Amino acid sequence: MARRKKIYEGKAKILYEGPEPGTIVQYFKDDATAFNAEKKAVIEGKGVLNNRLSEFFMTGLGHIGVPTHFIKRLNMREQLVRSVDIIPLEIIVRNYAAGTMSKRLGLEEGTQLPRPIVEYCYKDDKLGDPLVTEEHIAAFGWASQQDMDDMLSLALRVNDFLSGLMFGVGIRLVDFKIEVGRVYDGDFQRLVVADEISPDSCRLWDIESGRKLDKDVFRRDLGDLADAYTEVAQRLGVMPKNATPITKPTLIN
């Protein structure tokens, strides 16, 4: 079989050329990173869980008319996606104060915000993904005013969808981040949700206990990350609650 051409390798995923023009194969790694990759570990099974969860969320968004880059899951670790022109921004939607917002504004973690607050960060690991305003985005040409209007609309629709989905299984959606890319159909351009949606990119707290079920488990050494992600997948019905562990094949005499 011909060796696939690697396009890009990031902290959590590898992108390969897809089988058809305009497609990409997105491979989910087991690598976990925090604090802009200052803290690293390999968490067995994390890539499989994130692949399945991102498929679940992207498919659900498609069903309610939110465009995404997702085409189909190929196997346990890979999915086929549309090639997009990524806008170099992380779009963060916050429903409750946590993380950098708590530190920046002196808000107690878990404080409910008056309404969902949308923030933008410029994607640059060397700079620590700095917070930017719409003025920066327009001035540096990262996105047009129409793009910004569309990004805001997409982000809030994703928030409505994810918040309701999580609330239904006893999980609070504290905040999340998405990336958005441009796709072109002839002369027509539209924006789609790209990258991934998983516990790597969301803050998820158990409503009753406040227990964290996201990457903060790794950031703050709060327990087993794979167990937390598995619980999210099981609550959402993405994985069966009594899944049989995968074992090595045994020989039958």
UniProtKB/Swiss-Prot annotation:
- Which Cys-Cys disulfides exist here? none
A Gene Ontology biological process in which this protein takes part is: cobalamin biosynthetic process
User: Any idea which UniProt keywords this protein has?
Assistant: ATP-binding, Ligase, Nucleotide-binding, Purine biosynthesis
The EC number on file is 6.3.2.6
Q: In which pathway does it act?
A: Purine metabolism; IMP biosynthesis via de novo pathway; 5-amino-1-(5-phospho-D-ribosyl)imidazole-4-carboxamide from 5-amino-1-(5-phospho-D-ribosyl)imidazole-4-carboxylate: step 1/2
Q: Report which residue ranges the record marks as coiled coil.
A: none
* Catalyses which reaction(s): 5-amino-1-(5-phospho-D-ribosyl)imidazole-4-carboxylate + L-aspartate + ATP = (2S)-2-[5-amino-1-(5-phospho-beta-D-ribosyl)imidazole-4-carboxamido]succinate + ADP + phosphate + 2 H(+)
Any single Gene Ontology cellular-component annotation: cytosol
InterPro entries from the entry? SAICAR_synt/ADE2_N, SAICAR_synt_PurC, SAICAR_synth, SAICAR_synthetase, SAICAR_synthetase_CS
One matching Pfam family is SAICAR_synt
What SUPFAM superfamilies has UniProt attached to this entry?
SAICAR synthase-like
Q: What domain of life is recorded for the organism?
A: Bacteria
A molecular function GO annotation: phosphoribosylaminoimidazolesuccinocarboxamide synthase activity
> What HAMAP family does the database record attribute to this sequence?
SAICAR_synth
In terms of NCBIfam families, this protein maps to:
purC (TIGR00081)
Q: Which family does it belong to?
A: Belongs to the SAICAR synthetase family.
Q: What is this protein called?
A: Phosphoribosylaminoimidazole-succinocarboxamide synthase
Native organism: Roseobacter denitrificans (strain ATCC 33942 / OCh 114) (Erythrobacter sp. (strain OCh 114))
Its gene? purC
